[in-house]
């Protein structure tokens, strides 16, 4: 089943992106490099609750 997740910037802690993930395939927390409009650059975003 696909579940809603929120991606949080690791530097400024802003929650910038929402997405879905399949819990059966991805049990770990997702980490992606995405653009943060508050930092004005690409930063690592981690899955948060």
Curated annotation (Swiss-Prot):
What is the protein's species of origin? Answer: Natranaerobius thermophilus (strain ATCC BAA-1301 / DSM 18059 / JW/NM-WN-LF)
SUPFAM superfamilies noted in UniProt? Zn-binding ribosomal proteins (SSF57829)
Which cellular component appears as one GO term in the record?
A: cytoplasm
What NCBIfam families would the database entry show? PRK00504.1 (NF001764), PRK00595.1 (NF001860), rpmG_bact (TIGR01023)
State a single Gene Ontology molecular function: structural constituent of ribosome
Matching entries from Pfam families are given as: Ribosomal_L33 (PF00471)
Q: Could you tell me what this protein is called?
A: Large ribosomal subunit protein bL33
Q: Which family does it belong to?
A: Belongs to the bacterial ribosomal protein bL33 family.
InterPro entries, alphabetized:
Ribosomal_bL33 (IPR001705), Ribosomal_bL33_sf (IPR038584), Ribosomal_zn-bd (IPR011332)
Q: Which UniProt keywords apply?
A: Ribonucleoprotein, Ribosomal protein
> A biological process (GO) annotation for this entry?
translation
